[in-house]
Amino acid sequence: NTESTKGESLLGK
């Protein structure tokens, strides 16, 4: 999921 990747990127995962 692109949205999941975006969320993790914001968290710095």
Swiss-Prot record:
Tissue: Expressed by the venom gland.
Top-level lineage group: Eukaryota
Protein location: Secreted
Alphabetical keyword list: Secreted
GO-annotated cellular components: extracellular region
Misc. comment: The mature peptide does not contain cysteine residue.
Protein name per the record: Conopeptide Vi003
